[in-house]
Amino acid sequence: MKKLKCISFHEGLDIIEVESTFTRGLPNLSIVGLASTAIKESVERIKATLLSCDFAFPAKKITINLSPSGIPKKGSHFDLAIALLILLQNEELDDFFVVGELGLDGSIKSTNELFSLLLFLSAKIKKAKIVVPKSIAQKASMIPNLEVYGLENLNEAIEFFKEKNYENFRFSHNHPLFANPLQIENEIFLQNMDFKLDFKDIKGQEKAKRACMIAALGMHNILFEGSPGSGKSMCAKRLVYIMPPQSLSEILMQNAYMSLDSKDCEFTKIRAFRHPHHTSTRASIFGGGTKNARIGEVALANGGVLFFDEFPHFNKQIIESLREPLEDHKIHISRVNSKITYETKFSFIAAQNPCPCGNLFSKNLSCVCSENEIKKYKNHISAPVMDRIDLYVAMDEISKDDKTSISSKEMSEKILQAFIFSKKRGQKEFNGKLKDEDLSRFCVLEKDAKDTLDLAISRYNLSLRSLNKILKVSRSIADLEQSLNISKTHILEALSFRARN
C-alpha cells in the first residue's frame, strides 16, 4: 500500500493520508473516505488525463482511501496525489504533501482555496515538504515553514519522484518581512516599527492613552464613552500599532484567515484591525451564508482589534451575539455543507456617545435628551455584554490647552518590555485571554492588594466574571511596571477603569 499526504479544511485544517491498493478484479477506480462530489468527479478526470498523456491505466481494481475516513474532504486539489499513487506503484514516495488539480492535458493547476490551505499548513507544521502547481510555487515559497517544490505537469511529477532530483524543482524565496526577527524565550516574533497612525496626534486624553497601553499589552476589551470629536475613534485605530509583536505562527494564521476573505492578502507585521459599520448584517460580522460557512469579522479580527464605533447603533441581536466569541475566544459556524470553528482572540473596542445627542458630557453644548431617552440608549447594551468589558473610559472634550504627550513608538517600547517580562514567567496567553484556572498561577496578590479586592467585592457586589476581569487588568498594569506580584496600587487602577451604573 502506497501513501501520500494531502490537506483539506473542515472544522480546521486536516492532514489527509491518500492511500492506494491494487487488487484483482474488474478494472475500476473508486474513492472512499467521505469524499466530496468534486473529489469523486476526479475519477473520470484522472482516467482521461492518463490516457491523453499516453499512460496505461492499470487493469486492476484500484481503491483510493482518504484517511481519516470520518472527516469530510473537499476540493479538486486531490487529483495529483491520486494520479501519482496510480502511476508510481513501485516507487518509494518520500514524506511529501502533494496538492494540485489536473487538466486533461496533464497540466497541474491551482485552485481558489489552495493558497489558504498552504498558510494554514505552515501555521500547523514546521518544515513541511510540499509539491504545488508551478503557477503558485513562487508565491508559496514566501511562506515560512514550507519547503516548496513547483511542478508544471504530470510528466514532471513522475520525473520528480522517480529520479528524486528534488532540488531542480525547489523554489526558495525569503520574504523581506521575515528578516531581523526578534527571539523571545525560544520563539520567533516580528516587531512592527511602522507607526502610520501615532498617539502623539491626540491631544490630552491621558487616561484613554493609559487604557490603550493596558489593553494593547493584555488584549483587553475597552469601551470609550465621550462626546463627538473627543478622540474615541482615533485611540481605537492607533491601538494595533502598539500591540506586542506577533509570533511567526500568529502572522501565518492571520494571513490564512485573511486569505479566506480575500485572494490578495499581503504579509504584514501589523495586527488585524476590523471596523464593521453599524448597519452590517449578522452574517458579515459572525460569518455564515446559505450553504457554506463564510468567515466573518470576528474571526478576521483574530489576534488584533475588532472596533465597533457607535456601539448602541448596532442591532441588538448582533451585540448580544458578541458574548460567545468574547467569552470562549472561538466561534462555531454550522451550515448545510460545512461546519467550521474559528479562533476569536481579539481586543474588542467599542465607542459610543454618552446620550443620543452626544452632548451629555459637554461643557459647551447643552444636552437635549430626556432622562428616558438616555436610559433607553444606555440599556441597548445589556449587563452581560458590559460584564465582558475590561476597561471603561469616559472621555471629556478636547481643550485647546491640552498638549500632546507620549508617542506610539514610546508606548510600543514600554509594551514590548512588559511583554518580554510576561513571557519570562512562562505565560503563553495574553493577560486578557488567560483561562480562569490560570489566574492563581499568574495573578499573585500581595496582602494589601487582596484586602483591597475583598473590599471592592463587597462594596460593588462584583460577579465572578468581573472579579476575574479586574485580576487580568491588574496583571497587565503590574507587567507595565515589571512587577512580579500585583500590588494594591495595581488593583486600585484596575478598579478605576470599571464601568459603574
Q: What do these predicted regions represent?
A:
Residues M1-L223, S227-S230, L484-K488, L492, ...:
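Peripheral, non-AAA+ core regions of ATP-driven protein-machinery
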Residues V32-V43, P58, N65-G75, N315-N501:
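Basic, amphipathic alpha-helical bundle interface domains used for macromolecular binding and assembly
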Residues M213, F267, A272, S280-L306:
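Conserved alpha-helical scaffold flanking the Walker A/P-loop in AAA+ ATPase domains
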Residues L217, I222-C265, D328:
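Walker A/P-loop
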Residues F224, F308, A351:
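Hydrophobic anchor at the beta1->P-loop junction of P-loop NTPases
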Residues G226, G287, E310:
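The Walker A (P-loop) glycine that initiates the GxxxxGKT/S ATP-binding motif of P-loop NTPases
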Residues I242-G287, S347-I349, C355:
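P-loop NTPase switch/communication element
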Residues G303, D309-E310, S321:
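Walker B catalytic acidic pair
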